[in-house]
């Protein structure tokens, strides 16, 4: 995507804000953007012209196709977001909010492009982010302004992390754990984004182990174990099959994720055990600590006669980031257990290793613009709960994703390729049941009309918002397993 020189400069000098403004961020050179006293009409233009002159081809990045996934037209065509980008931007006579939205999109993409690649320039990135911080804040009235504020903050954090002069000055936003959990629960009430994966995976598990007396779930990333309470309730209340099915969960944790992650897994076990006791569900819980990202079945306690289920939730909100090599190690070893079911749930974010950072950035912007639009349809920006969720939960979520997509191309994969990887590495697809499809549609009926469920082959379901796919769930078994 190319940016005409004059058009790009004009993006900085709109009349939306006070021309004398500062931005709250720390630059890559070790000084705060708050220290800048910039006259946007004079000094700032000189800075941009100087940097662009020095960098030469900075504003002519390598040609990359903008994500046009799943037959979508443009980045987002919602009036609330004001975002509509395909291979360029129409400079007709858009409404004021739409015009500002287009400017913000171009500035975000320009900042992302300036921060990476062969022609990366920290100085140019710094001044673009300074302008963005002047134009937006998380408390603005439109979706696009608020979304741009979160992406600007995320890009600023990346700039700080990359600084070689002041790495010690970088600090991530830290929120009280109770606030984070509250925001997460509010998000679950606002959107089916998280519960879609939980619901479809749990239903598939119930169907797969219907006649099993002992069930062993190996959970790749248990987090708070939210989905397992509902599974226990269903096991206790079901009228068919063994009257007292024993459930055992093995939760993995990795030393690479730190002591906090290990403690969280242990606390999850205590909560699940207490809940199982309260409803009379036979239950046991094991914590499997891995010293590295590599997984070996020898680290598991296996009991003869148990039906093994593999649960793999990848990079959903509140889940820790795991490298592709870690996921491959886990799934490869899990295959040797001849699992009766493998549940795979992941976000539909395009992270193609053969595409550059700019492609991945645009697709991520597309993903979150759809999320913001879906939230707006159910809860207006004026609602304090919406602002709380955005500040405490969605902002850090955006920042974490930006960190992931800046990884070396060798460590970046398309999550859409995981089903293909399973099918070519000893797993077979399991058909989604009619009941599971109906339950997914019933879940969506509790929310706004823009959500939809799409079948992904015979063994998968996808949650979408209008034309954008958001989260997919697919179901598999070992080729050696008799169904």
Swiss-Prot record:
PANTHER family hit by this protein: OSJNBA0084A10.13 PROTEIN-RELATED (PTHR31636)
* Primary role: Probable transcription factor involved in plant development.
- Please state which protein family the record places this protein in: Belongs to the GRAS family.
- UniProt region (Leucine repeat I (LRI)), positions on chain: 102-165
Q: Where is this region: VHIID?
A: 184-251
Its tissue distribution reads: Expressed in seedlings, roots, leaves and flowers.
PROSITE patterns, A to Z:
GRAS (PS50985)
Species source reads Arabidopsis thaliana (Mouse-ear cress)
The ranges of region (SAW) come to: 403-477
Q: Does the record bear Transcription in its keywords?
A: yes
Region annotation PFYRE: residue ranges? Answer: 308-400
Main site of residence?
nucleus
- What do the Gene Ontology cellular component annotations say? nucleus
- Keywords assigned: Nucleus, Transcription, Transcription regulation
| Location relative to the cell | Nucleus
From the UniProt record, which GO molecular function terms apply? DNA-binding transcription factor activity
The lineage is:
Eukaryota, Viridiplantae, Streptophyta, Embryophyta, Tracheophyta
Q: Where is this region: Leucine repeat II (LRII)?
A: 267-299
Q: List the disulfide bonds.
A: none
Protein name listed in UniProt: Scarecrow-like protein 26
| Short sequence motif named VHIID, residue ranges | 215-219
């Amino acid at each position: 995507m190319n940016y005409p020189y004059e058009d790009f400069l004009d993006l900085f000098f709109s009349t939306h804000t006070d021309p004398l403004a500062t931005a709250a961020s720390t630059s890559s050179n070790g000084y705060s953007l708050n220290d800048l006293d910039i006259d946007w009409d004079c000094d700032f233009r000189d800075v941009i012209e100087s940097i662009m002159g020095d960098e030469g081809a900075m504003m002519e990045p390598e040609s990359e196709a903008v994500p046009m996934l799943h037959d979508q037209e443009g980045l987002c065509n919602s009036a609330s977001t004001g975002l509509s980008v395909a291979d360029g931007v129409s400079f007709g006579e858009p409404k004021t909010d739409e015009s500002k939205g287009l400017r913000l999109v171009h500035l975000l993409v320009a900042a992302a492009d300036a921060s990476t690649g062969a022609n990366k320039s920290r100085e140019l990135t710094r001044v673009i982010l300074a302008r963005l911080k002047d134009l937006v804040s998380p408390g603005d009235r439109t979706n696009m302004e608020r979304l741009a504020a979160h992406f600007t903050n995320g890009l600023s954090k990346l700039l700080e992390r990359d600084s070689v002069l002041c790495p010690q000055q970088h600090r991530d936003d830290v929120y009280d754990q109770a606030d984070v959990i509250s925001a997460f629960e509010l998000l679950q009430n606002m959107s089916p984004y998280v519960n879609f994966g939980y619901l479809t995976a749990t239903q598939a598990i119930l169907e797969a182990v219907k006649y099993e007396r002992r069930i062993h779930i190996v959970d790749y990333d248990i987090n708070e174990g939210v989905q397992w309470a509902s599974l226990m309730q269903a096991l206790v209340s079901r009228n068919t099959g063994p009257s007292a099915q024993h459930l055992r969960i093995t939760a993995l944790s990795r030393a690479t994720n730190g002591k906090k992650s290990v403690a969280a897994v242990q606390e999850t076990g205590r909560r699940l055990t207490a809940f199982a006791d309260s409803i009379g569900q036979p239950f046991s819980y094991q914590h499997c600590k891995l010293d590295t990202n590599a997984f070996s079945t020898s680290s598991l306690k296996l009991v003869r006669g148990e039906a093994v289920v593999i649960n793999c939730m990848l990079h959903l909100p509140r889940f820790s980031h795991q490298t592709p090599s870690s996921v491959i190690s886990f799934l490869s070893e899990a295959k040797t257990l001849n699992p009766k079911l493998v549940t795979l749930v992941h976000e539909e974010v395009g992270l193609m290793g053969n595409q550059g950072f700019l492609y991945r950035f645009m697709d991520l912007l597309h993903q979150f613009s759809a999320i913001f639009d879906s939230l707006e349809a159910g809860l207006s920006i004026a609602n304090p709960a919406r602002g709380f969720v955005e500040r405490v939960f969605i902002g850090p979520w955006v920042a974490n994703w930006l960190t992931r997509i800046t990884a070396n191309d060798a460590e970046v994969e398309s999550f859409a390729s995981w089903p293909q990887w399973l099918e070519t590495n000893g797993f077979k697809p399991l058909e989604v049941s009619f009941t599971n499809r109906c339950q997914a549609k019933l879940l969506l009926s509790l929310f706004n009309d823009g959500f939809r469920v799409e079948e992904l082959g015979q063994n998968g379901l996808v949650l979408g918002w209008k034309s954008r796919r958001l989260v997919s769930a697919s179901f598999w078994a070992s080729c050696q397993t008799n169904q």
